[in-house]
Amino acid sequence: MEFTESASLCWYTVHVRSRHEFKVLDRLTKAGIDAFLPAVERLSRWKDRKKLISFPLFPGYLFVHIRKMYEDMLTVLKTHGVVRFISLIPGEPEPVPEEQIMSLKIVLENKETVDPYPYLKEGQRVKIKKGPLAGAHGLLVKRESQHMLVLSVDILRQGISVKVDASDVETL
């Protein structure tokens, strides 16, 4: 792995132990690492009660915003619960495009209803031009006579979908 002294900050995907996403997020934050765990709230029901519970949108994964430097990567890897960085080439962590992280944050901050969506590479790339999701980029697809914006995280081969009005989007 090549390391540079003046490396800029990039987002990387980290694989974590099963059901340890929130604990690892807390540990990374306490270590001074900028970490992002896309999560959604779902209503869980038991026999005697109902409660809103936060669930990771991509179970087993979270994102870290670090420099591609030995010290930063080692700090992340030494964090209890972290398994490895996701990479296409062994030993070479694959950066996640800033646009994909920002689009996820825009959708999640606006409390839109999201559904996990299978990974898609082909399709029309669009940007939402107005409304609460303005600025989010993704793929426009049609499902059951409704238009959906699909935000894909390429490195994970996963994505999410959110309902949009087709008139609110423009092609890139």
List PLM regions with ranges.
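Short, charged beta-turn/beta-strand-edge "cap" motif at the junction between a beta-strand
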Residues: 131-134
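Short beta-strand-centered aromatic/proline hotspots
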Residues: 136-141
